[in-house]
């Protein structure tokens, strides 16, 4: 709850995959009002008749705005400043692009921060501490971007910070080991 008496509000980047869906659930469990943003790219793998992001938004009863990534996105993937990840995906450049757009939307809806389903250590190119810091800085979201962190990192951080929230929220999720997250 904010000093004004209203609930804290956050904008979540929701792909509809497990990690972003869990991130939404975690925010809602903490009493944070959530609105979601989903980027539709030419490479979107949504099933006919349904999209994972739309299904998750409906399940959690949260507003979802679908945004076409557009031609700017295509320019970025043709010549990414930070290079390609596995399978030719320009991970870092895509995250910066999407988060810059998300920042504008967050301002419109008066969200205090933005969160993603990024999990520290899950992807070697874009989901390590250095890359997440770069993405946060280049997107202009210093201290306004929250991501998910694995158990061992959380435990070390809690010891260091005595369990308090600082610039980010640190949750216990295990990254690529999705079976553990589902139990």
Language model feature labels by segment:
Residues 1-183:
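ATP-dependent adenylation/nucleotidyltransferase module used to activate substrates
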């Amino acid at each position: 709850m904010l000093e004004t008496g209203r609930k804290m509000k956050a904008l979540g980047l929701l792909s509809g995959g497990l990690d972003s869906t869990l991130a939404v659930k975690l925010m809602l469990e903490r009493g944070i009002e959530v609105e979601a943003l989903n980027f539709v790219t030419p490479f979107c793998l949504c099933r006919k008749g349904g999209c994972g992001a739309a299904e998750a938004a409906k399940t959690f009863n949260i507003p979802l705005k679908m945004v076409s990534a557009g031609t700017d996105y295509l320019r970025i993937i043709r010549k990414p400043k930070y290079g390609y990840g596995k399978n030719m995906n320009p991970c870092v450049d895509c995250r910066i692009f999407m988060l810059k757009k998300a920042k504008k939307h967050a301002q419109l809806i008066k969200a205090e921060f933005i969160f993603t389903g990024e999990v520290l250590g899950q992807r070697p190119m874009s989901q390590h501490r250095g890359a997440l810091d770069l993405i946060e800085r280049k997107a202009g979201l210093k201290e306004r971007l929250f991501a998910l962190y694995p158990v061992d990192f959380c435990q070390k951080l809690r010891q260091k910070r005595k369990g308090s929230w600082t610039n980010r929220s640190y949750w216990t999720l295990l990254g690529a080991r999705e079976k553990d997250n589902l139990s």
